[in-house]
Amino acid sequence: MKFQKYYGIPKDAKYGEEFMGRFPILFQDNKKSMQETCMCWGIDCPIGWYHILEQLCTYLEFHNQQFSKEYGIAVVADQVKEKFGTLRFYFSIAFVDKETGLKVGPDDENDETTSETAALYVARDYLDMLADEAIGEAEMMTEDTCADCGVPLTKDNKVETEGWITFLCDECNAKREEEYANRLNHQENVEQKS
């Protein structure tokens, strides 16, 4: 998959129900309990990656629509989060209803290998490969994208914060440092008054 370069973050961008609702097959587990899925927590990523996640999810949902109708399989998100400064997108290939795209249990009653089941396994492996490649590319892109504003990072403007790993541009890093200094000053003033 080829991702487009940064095209900006919409002012109303967020990863809530509306975002996930645009990709109903991919995010079909987001309303399930925490005993069933980590998607109950939603998408836990910096807003600076919005354009990357939007393109990735559009790509995966496109393939989901094709593979669910043809083979009854789809990519279903298990967890989407930031970890160590980059995207982590965990998924599974699920058996789905060919009409609705919603998960169904596998047909375990027939253990025979037929040409139809052989084609299904080939399709499943191919869909898994497509998803792995696209997700891998997206994960690498997040390392070179400012977590706050989404601009592409280069070795000249990339700052890796200490402690909690985050990749920021110089401008966003300066804003965070200023906010942190202001919080420290406020805390010191409160402590002096008491």
Question: What do these predicted regions represent?
Answer:
Residues 17, 21, 29, 33-35, ...:
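Interaction interfaces in information-processing and related assembly proteins
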Residues 141-145, 162-165:
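Short metal-coordination and nucleic-acid-contact micro-motifs, chiefly zinc-binding Cys/His arrays
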Residues 146-149, 169:
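Short cysteine-rich clusters marking metal-coordination/redox-active sites
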Residues 153-155, 173-176:
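Cys/His-rich microdomains that often coordinate metals
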Residues 156-161, 179-181:
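Short Cys/His-rich "knuckle" micro-motifs
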Residues 162-175:
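Cysteine-rich micro-motifs
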Residues 174-189:
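Short metal-binding segments enriched for Cys and/or His
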